Design a protein with these regions (language model features):
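Rhodanese-like catalytic fold shared by cysteine-dependent sulfurtransferases
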Residues: 1-36, 52, 59-95, 103-227
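A conserved helix-loop-strand patch within extracytoplasmic ligand-binding domains
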Residues: 35-39, 47
Length: 227
């Protein structure tokens, strides 16, 4: 998937070597990928069927920002928990899975095929590809899609969404949540206000002060959002 941005979506370049792209707890070696990736239009047909079990392969906070209508939330905090969640389904069921860009689903797809599941479908290119190719009128998507860069969330046509990120807990924030009395820019939000220590709040407040000072002197601060 390719998408354009008017600003630098990442603060800096990082290259890491990891054993797994998305840790799931099982090895994939010399395996032929199942040919069951559906394009957005094919996907719409499959998920509208009553016997299709639609599963969101992402984390709960991503699900809360937006998801497909009638999709199931596995309520996982990391991808290693996903196999255990999948084991509850019957091998004869029609399983349709999706994630942000398709990577997580590729691994889950292989996992289910190895377990003997016959009817498994994944969204080719993930949610990003879907939002880029399906207009809102024909869409089965509800809400926005969380992305792991400075855009925070995107809408149909890959337009930037309305969410921002809390500097205290790094969780996405809606416009409504930012109106809460527990929200303080750069420090905390309703999701972390009651969980942060006084020391953490003090450190975050100092960081926010530095960002404001940098802005006044027209200097770029590494933590300053550019959207």
């Amino acid at each position: 998937n390719n998408s354009n941005s008017k600003f630098n979506p990442f603060h800096k370049l990082k290259i890491k070597i990891k054993k797994e792209v998305v840790p799931m707890g099982f090895k994939v070696r010399n395996y032929n990928y199942p040919k069951n990736n559906l394009n957005p239009r094919e996907w719409n047909k499959i998920i509208k069927k009553k016997d299709t079990v639609l599963i969101d392969a992402r984390k709960s906070f991503e699900y809360d920002v937006g998801t497909f209508k009638k999709s199931l939330n596995p309520n996982i905090e990391n991808f290693r928990q996903f196999p255990k969640y999948l084991n509850q389904f019957k091998k004869s069921e029609n399983i349709a899975m999706f994630c942000t860009g398709g990577i997580r689903c590729e691994k889950a797809n292989i996992y289910l095929k190895k377990k003997g599941f016959k009817n498994v479908y994944v969204l080719k290119g993930g949610i990003i590809n879907y939002l880029n190719n399906i207009d809102k009128k024909n869409s089965q998507w509800s809400g926005e899609c969380f992305v792991f860069d400075n855009r925070v969330s995107i809408k149909h046509g890959l337009k930037q969404g309305s969410y921002s990120v809390c500097s205290g807990c790094r969780k996405p924030l809606s416009v409504k949540e930012k109106k809460s009395s527990k929200y303080l820019e750069g420090i905390h939000c309703p999701k972390c206000h009651d969980h942060l220590t006084d020391d953490q709040k003090s450190r975050f407040a100092m960081r926010q002060k530095q960002i404001i000072l940098a802005k006044k002197t027209s200097k770029r601060h590494i933590f300053k959002k550019e959207y």
